[in-house]
Structures are given as structure tokens and as C-alpha cells.
């Protein structure tokens, strides 16, 4: 079993969710010392990848009872009770190959989901989805994770790459909820597709982005300038920032 995604509760730092491959969801209420496996109807097999895996986990920043999970390749799951029960959500979501999810707390509150070639949005808690048509904007069309800036719901970041096995990647930013996009200038050429994001709840301008093969980039001004951390890791599946 591999851990592919983690998410920290916005108000209860000891509550952590984890998603794995093969696909399963776990929850800890004591900072990760003990874990319980959650009851979720997830696929055991799927096309294109050997085992389905949880590639997205989000806790709603304003209604903490709503938790989202995205599965590659098994669509979106939603919990309305903090992870106790789950429902598969699919209306209008044409691709079940989920790579990332994010929540924009603006008016209206918007849930965003990234798939290999598209970013979808929902303003009705996942009952229906609309595509943004990002393929016409991105120079590297393969999409992985997605992040919404905590204090600016119109600002969206997407981690992209050439292909699932590409040799490099980049970061895209939109300041108008996905209508237009710009490519971020990074201090080095990433060694694989860019893969995942993490952000600081207390300082929304501080954002981390990683490549699949262990490079981590940081910005302290909301994406205008990026630095590469000197330390590198092996494969990175996901990141999360906790206040303690």
C-alpha cells in the first residue's frame, strides 16, 4: 500500500485524512498516531493504471463537514459528515480520471477538479460540472494538481507536464477563475511533470509546489517569484501544511 494524498482539517490539526493506492481512505484524530479505514465504495480495478488510487483530498474551508476525495480512475467521492459516509458524484464530470481538487470559497463557492486534459468546476456542491477548456491555453496539456489561493478565490494554480511520463513540467496561474492563464517562471527546469501543491492557511502568499521526482519550489508572494529548495526527495505523491 502506498500513501498518495493527505489533507489536514482546517480547524482541528490533529484530524488528518489520507488516501492510498490501492484506493482507500483513512482518518486520524490524534495527529497520525492511530488511523481508521473509512467505509467508501471504491473501485478495485480500473483502466490504464494497475490499481485505482486516491489522488485528491480536500476539506471544505468553511463547512468542515464536507470532505472531497478524487480517485484515479474512479471519479469523485463526497462526504457531508466529516468522512463518516461517502457518495460518488459524477453529474457532468465526463472523465473519471481525477488528478486534483480544490475549493474556491468565493461567491459562489466553487469546487474545482483536474483531470488529465481538463479542469472542471461545480457551484452546486458537485451535483453538476462544467469544463474550463484549458487545453487551448496550456503549453503542456497534462494536468495534475490544482490549488486555489486561500485569500483570493479568483486565483487558481494548476500543475502541468508534457504527459504522464514527461521529462519536465510547469505551473499555470489564472487570476480570473480560469478565463485566462499565465505560465509561471521557475528558477530551474523541473525534472518531471509538476505534481502537487500545499499552502499555508495563515499566509496564503506562501505556496509549495513539487515535481513528481522530488523537487520542491516555493513562493512567498503568491506566485510572482519562485525559489527551488536545495533538498530533493524521491517520488512525492502529495503535500500538506499544518499549523503546528
What are the residue ranges of the model-derived segments?
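Extracellular glycan-interacting surfaces
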Residues: 1-244
Amino acid at each position: 500500500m502506498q500513501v498518495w494524498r493527505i489533507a489536514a482539517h482546517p480547524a482541528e490539526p490533529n484530524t488528518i485524512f489520507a488516501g492510498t493506492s490501492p484506493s482507500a481512505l483513512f482518518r486520524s484524530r490524534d495527529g497520525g498516531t492511530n488511523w481508521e479505514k473509512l467505509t467508501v465504495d471504491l473501485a478495485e480495478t480500473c483502466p490504464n493504471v494497475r490499481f485505482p488510487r486516491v489522488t485528491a483530498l480536500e476539506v471544505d474551508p468553511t463547512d468542515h463537514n464536507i470532505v472531497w476525495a478524487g480517485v484515479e480512475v474512479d471519479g469523485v467521492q463526497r462526504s457531508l459528515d466529516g468522512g463518516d459516509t461517502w457518495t460518488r458524484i459524477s453529474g457532468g464530470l465526463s472523465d473519471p480520471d481525477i488528478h486534483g481538487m480544490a475549493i474556491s470559497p468565493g461567491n459562489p463557492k466553487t469546487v474545482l477538479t483536474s483531470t488529465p486534459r481538463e479542469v472542471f468546476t461545480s457551484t452546486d456542491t458537485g451535483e453538476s460540472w462544467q469544463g474550463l477548456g484549458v487545453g487551448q491555453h496550456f503549453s503542456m496539456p497534462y494536468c495534475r494538481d490544482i490549488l486555489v489561493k486561500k485569500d483570493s478565490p479568483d486565483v487558481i494554480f494548476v500543475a502541468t507536464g508534457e504527459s504522464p511520463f514527461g521529462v519536465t513540467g510547469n505551473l499555470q496561474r489564472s487570476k480570473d477563475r480560469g478565463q485566462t492563464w499565465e505560465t509561471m517562471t521557475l528558477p530551474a527546469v523541473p525534472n518531471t511533470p509538476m505534481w502537487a501543491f500545499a499552502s499555508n492557511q495563515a499566509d496564503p502568499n506562501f505556496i509549495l509546489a513539487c515535481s513528481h521526482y522530488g523537487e520542491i519550489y516555493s513562493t512567498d508572494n503568491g506566485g510572482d517569484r519562485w525559489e527551488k529548495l536545495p533538498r530533493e526527495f524521491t517520488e512525492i505523491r502529495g503535500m500538506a501544511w499544518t499549523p503546528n
